Amino acid sequence: MNIKTVGALAMLALLAAACSEDKPMTTGQTTGAAAAAAPGIVPGSEEDLKTNVGDRVFFDFDKSNVKAEGKDVLDRQAAWLGKYGQVNVQIAGNCDERGTEEYNIALGQRRANAARDYLVAKGVASGRITTISYGKDRPTALGSNEDAWKQNRNAITEVK
């Protein structure tokens, strides 16, 4: 083949690819309102978890027990992790700014462990979940008031 023929074939292939219709990839994983609310999000990604499932649970002051609202989020996370068996996660426990660094590191770890233990009880393999505590070092909300403190008392699940 000569260069003109190769060039013409390459142009034809490029033209054919440009004219093809893009069809969304369907996996059967996302349905209903979640699918409509989050177009373009890759199923099984951190953005999918955050947008369609929820990535964090909140705790009361000086507590590490999972509240009812947190159980709802963790139930959705367990179901999502069941769909995406190849996905591993890290749960980061966080605290508000009150208390010593040492105390908040320990409390954040108890919060991360509580979320992990709940997911494991729901059937997620413990080997897929790691935990870490950031104590008060990674606030979600800035401020020294109850609204900010409530947002910072959390455990955040991240895809790893």
Label the model's feature ranges.
Residues 15-18:
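C-terminal motif of bacterial Sec signal peptides marking the signal peptidase cleavage site
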Residues 94-160:
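Periplasmic OmpA-like peptidoglycan-binding domain that tethers envelope proteins to the cell wall
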Residues 7-13:
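Sec-dependent N-terminal signal peptides
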Residues 1-7:
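Bacterial N-terminal signal peptides that target proteins for export
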Residues 1, 75-76, 143:
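A generic local structural motif
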Residues 3, 64-65, 102-103:
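Short, contiguous strand/loop micro-motifs
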Residues 20-88:
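Periplasmic peptidoglycan-binding/tethering modules of Gram-negative envelope proteins
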